[in-house]
């Protein structure tokens, strides 16, 4: 988790602790800390470590309730971090 924190900080974001319930970090837009609420909620994980679909849906719904964008930060086996924006998909 620290490496993800450090990567976000190096990109110029303001990073604060998560709210609990599975979210690791709150991330504020560059230069906007204190002016607006966090735009992103970061859920961090390692490549190959499974997460249940139920847990992912629960965190996604909570982020939607808070009007935040959920981002999955995955650290791969080489130590690189890849970010995925998560949103709900409805099939009809």
Sequence positions of predicted segments:
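Acidic-basic catalytic patches of nuclease active cores, encompassing PD-(D/E)XK
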Residues: 1-18
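Active-site beta-strand-loop-beta-strand hairpin of nuclease catalytic cores
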Residues: 28-41
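Helix-rich interaction surfaces within compact, conserved domain-sized segments
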Residues: 43-92
């Amino acid at each position: 988790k620290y490496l993800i924190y450090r990567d976000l900080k190096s990109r110029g974001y303001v990073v604060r602790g998560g709210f609990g319930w599975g979210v690791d970090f709150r991330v504020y837009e560059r230069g906007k800390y204190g002016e607006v609420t966090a735009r992103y909620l970061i859920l961090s994980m390692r490549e190959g470590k499974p997460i249940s679909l139920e847990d992912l849906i629960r965190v996604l719904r909570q982020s939607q309730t808070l009007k935040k964008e959920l981002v999955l930060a995955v650290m791969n086996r080489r130590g690189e971090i890849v970010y995925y924006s998560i949103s709900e998909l409805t099939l009809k």
